[in-house]
Amino acid sequence: MVPKVTSGANVYGVLQYNRIKVEAGEGRILYMQGIPERSDGRFSIEECAEAFGYYTALNPRVRKPVVHFSLNPSPEDRLSEAQLTRLAAEFMERMGYGRQPYVVFLHEDIARRHMHIVSVR
């Protein structure tokens, strides 16, 4: 599996992209680390951005603090949601983002299931 990595300056844009997939029934949140869950279970871009903001403020010189990973397991791999979550957590740990806040989205908008992970540098 080869991850696609993009970085950017606007956390709202990448979170909105993923929220649209969730609201359209083409995706869902698999896991959130370091981001408080709401009592109503809904995803809040504002609260997520606030959790990320603490980390981006630590190094204001970073021009593109948002990192977005797309992980595409082989279509032949029939991984459970628990396995996908573990795969995402292991990936983030190995990339050095294991202690950062991040959100793992599962997308099912194309022929294969894939994950999008949003975090900050």
Model-derived regions: residue spans:
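N-terminal nicking endonuclease/strand-transfer module with a His-rich metal-binding environment
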Residues: 1-121
